[in-house]
Amino acid sequence: MSKITMTTPLVEMDGDEMTRILWQMIKDELLIPFIDLKTEYYDLGLEERNRTDDQVTVESAKATMKYGVAVKCATITPNAARMTEYNLKEMWKSPNGTIRAMLDGTVFRAPIVVKGIEPNVKTWVKPITIARHAYGDVYKATEMKVAGPGKAELVFTAEDGTETRELIHEFKGAGVIQGQHNLDDSIESFAHSCFKYALDTKQDLWFATKDTISKKYDHTFKDIFQEIFDAQYKDAFEKAGITYFYTLIDDAVARVMKSEGGFIWACKNYDGDVMSDMISSAFGSLAMMTSVLVSPHGYYEYEAAHGTVQRHYYKHLKGEETSTNSVATIFAWTRFSRKSRLRCSRESFALFPSARLP
């Protein structure tokens, strides 16, 4: 049997631990026997990121901008224990965070619904899609530990040298400080992606922050969403028979648990990170969740929504049997292939008939 041909290489980002093992198995057993696979390969394993001072992550994002479509394996975001385990030069930032910052756009995560696996929340009869803002907040934060008494200030220096200062806290002892930021342009792109995706999929869109507490930071998100919706999408939503709904994040959680599903839940970066894991677990498993980063510039990056499955990897190293669920990683490859079908021969379109575009 002749292999399906590819006309343009696509970006492949390898990863860590057990998912790295699965990654190679999927290629060897499901892809390479049938496709003349052409990828521009980047090893985002923690050892290679450490060797290159994380430059390999930056280069993989640039390649995605060049070729338009990428598929990514799960990767380790190091903590103190990983620093010791891998003898790292420094505690490298999340590769996902770096890639998201460079590509912008929105991460859409949805459960893989199959017969025989019922949601733990009995009212849920339809999938719930999490739209996670892909830039800023805690993932691009700067942090500092303070050893003793002192004054912490938030300082903005304008181009003309003018300074604006806000007191953060008068420390009486040791503590920690964190500075976060976001960009109006990125929030606007997030809003457009969410509204367009809702129209494409004919689903209601929910958005939630904590603007009653964060009266400038979170309120900016709320205001930008509402302004864009009123000016550009309100009529289209009415014609499509769908709605845009804003509420506080705690109220949204309560409503979600009582809903039947079938909507898109737009969240800020951290909220989306947490809630997507909750949604996936309640629908069955973290290994049954798709994830795609959609950039307003036309870039797509597909991956599984779960991590590297560390415990299984340690068992694998000992020669013990594991039963790691590979479904979400397989779906990342199928969605990647489906999206890139124009770069392949026509036969590849039929190879993954169940794969769905974002």
Across the structure, where does each feature detected by a protein language model lie?
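Solvent-exposed alpha-helices and their adjacent loops that cap or buttress functional pockets
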Residues: S2-I4, V11, K62-M65, P119-W124, ...
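N-terminal alpha-helical transmembrane segments of multi-pass membrane transport
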Residues: S2-T8, M18-W23, D28-D53, A61-T64
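Short coil/turn connectors at secondary-structure junctions
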Residues: T5-T8, L37, M65-V69, T123-P127, ...
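Glycine-rich phosphate/diphosphate-binding loop of Rossmann-like nucleotide-binding domains
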Residues: M6-M25, E29, L154-T247
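Active-site rim loops that border cofactor/substrate pockets in soluble metabolic enzymes
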Residues: D43-L46, Y217-W265, N269, V274, ...
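N-terminal glycine-rich phosphate/adenylate-binding segment common to multiple enzyme folds
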Residues: E47-E163, Y270-V274
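Glycine-rich phosphate/nucleotide-binding loop
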Residues: V256-P353
